[in-house]
Amino acid sequence: MAAWRSTEHLQDHFLRHRRRLRVASVSAYVASAEETIRVGVYFEYRDPETDEPRVGYYDPFTGRFVGLSDNEGEILTRFRCSERYVMHALPGSTYV
């Protein structure tokens, strides 16, 4: 399973996205990311800031998105968004 870059990176993302994801703890945030990777739709895209290749998983039933490094070894971000976002706002998205 993919890991977060660091404890600080995980904590920062948890604090930014916890309310919208409705999770009360870091462990629930991590479990939610792992579940999204398990059940979500795989797609590829390019990072909007760095243009680096990325892998995404999106669960259209919950609106949960996880962005990973291109080798899927590192979780880079985790938040809730619309299907339209993963289709059209992420550069080069292969999500259908």
Tell me the role of every PLM-derived stretch.
Residues 1-54:
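Compact soluble domain cores
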Residues 12-16, 20, 50, 62, ...:
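Low-complexity, compositionally biased segments
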Residues 45-71:
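Basic/aromatic recognition patch in beta-strand/loop cores that engages polyanionic ligands
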Residues 66-96:
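A short, surface-exposed interaction/processing loop segment used at functional sites
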